[in-house]
Amino acid sequence: MEQFKGLQKSLYIWTDSAELDKRVETLKAATGGEVAVENVHRLSFSSYANSSFDLIVIECAQLTDNYVKLLHMLKPSGILHLFAYIGPAGSLLQEIKLSGFINCREDAVANTLTAEKPGYETGSSARLSFAKKTSSVNVWKISGDDEELIDEEELLDEEDKQKPDPAGLRVCSTTGKRKACKNCSCGLAEELESEKTTKTVTENAKSSCGNCYLGDAFRCSTCPYLGMPAFKPGEKVQLADNLLKSDI
């Protein structure tokens, strides 16, 4: 047991009380630390805290199958040492591995098995550093600073803002004036006639019923204001020249 030298706290689990004190003293001398003693049949009733021992030595290991509890009782990197076992070592090693122990090995000459608890506490977790953190973009958040607005002043050019020059209006190719000749064939005569028919009069039309200003719902069938929006009484309304002429 020289390989256990320097371990501070050990647990010796026994099955045979004969020469028990001698075996405990041998373990204490080998480790140089404190040694607790527990019967293998009382192990399931014991109340040892987790990570209590650096070394657990158990004899006649086939008498217990509570290796998971032994794993919790050991400190990280603690050692489980079994000796005087009976039966094939392969099945016992497999059972120990399935309980969570690592580095399980057999010494056929000394008829012993040794295993270790991993270097971390049972149930512990660690953050993985290789995971890439993906930044989530909040697509529902719209910032006014990021939105490109169209400048209204850029929609119109300087030419669009200038008023049309009367001198640039269409004129007769014969007279050179905005007046159609007698036998006009360029279309100016029709254009001037269209402007004349759409010219509005400034005088108010006379109402016979007095309800013309209320809207079409209150106007008669021959009302010259049909189709026009309602207006205030006394308000001057301009009608096209052809609306004041009789159709007959």
From Swiss-Prot:
Q: Which residues form a coiled coil?
A: none
Location of the protein in the cell: Cytoplasm; Mitochondrion intermembrane space
Q: Which GO molecular function entries does the Swiss-Prot or TrEMBL record give?
A: 2 iron, 2 sulfur cluster binding; 4 iron, 4 sulfur cluster binding; electron transfer activity; metal ion binding
Primary location group: cytoplasm
The segment annotated Linker runs over 131-161
Give the location of motif Cx2C motif 1 in residue numbers: 209-212
Give the residue interval(s) assigned to the motif Cx2C motif 2.
Answer: 220-223
- Needs which cofactor? [2Fe-2S] cluster; [4Fe-4S] cluster
Per its UniProt record, what InterPro entries does this chain match? Anamorsin (IPR007785), Anamorsin_N_metazoan (IPR049011), CIAPIN1 (IPR046408), SAM-dependent_MTases_sf (IPR029063)
Region of interest called Fe-S binding site A, as start-end residue ranges on this chain: 172-186
The Gene Ontology biological process annotation of the record reads: iron-sulfur cluster assembly
Q: Name one GO cellular component term.
A: mitochondrial intermembrane space
Q: Which residues are noted in the entry as [4Fe-4S] cluster-binding? A: 209, 212, 220, 223
> Which keywords belong to this entry?
2Fe-2S, 4Fe-4S, Cytoplasm, Iron, Iron-sulfur, Metal-binding, Mitochondrion
Residue ranges, annotated region (N-terminal SAM-like domain): 4-130
Looking at the record's lineage, which domain of life comes first?
Eukaryota
The domain comment in this protein's record states: The C-terminal domain binds 2 Fe-S clusters but is otherwise mostly in an intrinsically disordered conformation.
Regarding protein family, the annotation reads: Belongs to the anamorsin family.
Name recorded for this polypeptide: Anamorsin homolog
Report the source organism: Drosophila virilis
Gene that this sequence comes from: CIAPIN1
